[in-house]
Structure formats: structure tokens, C-alpha cells
Amino acid sequence: MQTYGNPDTTYGWWAGNSGVANRSGKFIAAHVAHAGLIVFWAGAFTLFELSRFDPSVPMGHQPLIVLPHLATLGIGFDANGVAMGDTKPVLAIAIVHLVSSMVLAAGGLLHSLLLPGNLEDSDIARARKFNIEWDNPDKLTFILGHHLLFLGFAVIAFVEWARVHGIYDPAIGAVRQVEYELNLAKIWNHQTDFLTIDSLEEVMGGHAFLAFVEITGGAWHIATKQVGEFTKFKGKGLLSAEAVLSWSLAGIGWMAIIAAFWSAANTTVYPVEYFGEPLELKFSISPYWIDTVDLPDGEFTSRAWLANVHYYFGSVSYTHLTLPTIYSV
């Protein structure tokens, strides 16, 4: 879809990111606005689920996605999936997300309408450092490094929340503080048996290790330059907007597929009280999961929604790994 080296190329409204691939300012505007849509969905869907929540029915047997995750964080609900006293904490989280989405939307409009369409034209030297050059690995890894730093800090926030506030432990049926166990041998071994992990300490230990890797990797990408000439042997000519997009989508898709298998089977990270009973794996044209508990016709557990939606969305994202990359070379 992207045509490089042709200054006369025009794009229709349907072309998406192709219209901003070589205009870093507009590229940022699109990404900030997209982030605003995601955050708006989180806030709006929290309110939507809260309005439909029925305390007389187990939370895991209702078509909910957002509320069970808040419950596992020890916010708003008890061990039976019943609202604790009032729902003000859940309501506050929804409102914060909605307000944040408006801030992000304003940022998207700011970058789109008022700031330079290309960061290379910015009067601010620091902004010019983030100008995108798709076949320049130094530029791309510099930007990647900052992404990794933010991801690492977000993981630290989650680990600290579990340590200070606490998260829900289905083994005792209550919210408790969880100290991470940074055992590298266990973390390495859980690459193959993570579906059955039953220790929150080890789960948080894996997150703590992930935060270290992301922050260290982010600092490395920001601080270092390519060693020697960037030759074809090292990948010169392979980097492009389509290639980076396809690899990114493939990475997201792979994570979604892993999350599907994990959420379908694991009852420590995804407690039965909030997500419903473990699922049964079936095969047709593709894998899918069905509930193992009797529910009224047309109704499914939170776990069934979570696993199947993650798998099919992940599969669609993963298919972008091939053709866009091939046609961009």
C-alpha cells in the first residue's frame, strides 16, 4: 500500500497509516488518537459492564471482561464477585479513563492540526530526534528504547501494586499482598509449564524480571549505535513501514494466542470466582474453547469470551507477518 520514493502518491481516507508513514508528526497524531480510543473503550466498557452486572449471578458466569480484571486487582468486589459496599472505586477508574481519553484525543488533534506534520521540521531539537526513518536502525532502535522503558515502568507499577496493595489469591479466597520471587531458574522453567503455574509469587517474579529486561533493553537501545556499517547482511533494505507494522502485529498476535491458552486453563491468574470454570479445547476449522459448566442457551462464561476473542483476534494479527513484509522488500 505504501509507495516509497514517489512524491505524487496520494491516499484515500481508507488507507490508514499509509498516509502518515513518512510524516512522523502525523504518525504520532494517529497513534495518540488511537491510544485515546483504547482508553475510551476501557472507561466506557467498565460503565457498560457495571450497569449490566447482576450480583445474584456468579461473576464468572456473566459476559464480563473488564470487571473480573478489576476484581483480581482487589478493586470493588469480594471473593464471591459481589460488589463490596459500593462501586465508587470502579466508577472512579472508569471516569479517570474517560477523562484520560479526552486528554489523548486533544493530544492527537494538537499533533495533527497545530504541530509540524514531520518532526524533522520541528524547532525543538529533542523532537527532531524522534523523526522516523524506516531504513535507519539507529533511529528506530532509539524510538524502540523509549517504548521499552515505558513498558518496563508499567510492569513495575503492577508488581508494586501486588506488593503494597495486594491482589486476589484464589488459594485463600481473599486479597493479599504478594512479594515477588525472583528465582531465575523457576522463571526460565515456566516457559514450558506456565499454563499450570499456581504461585502468585512466581507470577510476580516473572513480571519483575520482565521489567528488568525491558528497562535494561530500553536503555541499551537508546544509548547504543550500530557497530560497523549497516550492511545488507545485517538487514539493510528489510526495514520499512510495512515490515515494522507486520512484525508488530505478529508480536501482538502471538501474545494474544498465548493469553488465550493461558486464560482458558489457568485458575490462579484467572480465578474461577471471577472468570468461570476452566474451558475444554475443541478443534474444527481452528481451535476453540467451550464451557465445562451448564449455562442457559446463548450465555457463556467470562473465560470463554476472553479465550476465544483473544485467540481469533490474535490469529488475524499474526497473519500480517508475511505478505506486508514480502511486498515491502
Language model features: what each stretch is:
Residues 50-70, 116-130, 162-183, 227-234, ...:
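Interhelical loop segments of eukaryotic multi-pass membrane proteins
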Residues 319-325:
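Conserved small/polar residues in nucleotide/adenosyl-binding loops
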Residues 13-30, 64-96, 127-144, 175-208, ...:
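Juxtamembrane membrane-interface segments at transmembrane-helix boundaries in membrane proteins
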Residues 33-34, 38-39, 49-55, 84-101, ...:
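Hydrophobic alpha-helical transmembrane bundles of multi-pass membrane proteins
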Residues 1-12:
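Extended, low-complexity, polar regulatory segments
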Residues 21, 27-29, 35-38, 43-47, ...:
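Soluble secreted/lumenal catalytic domains
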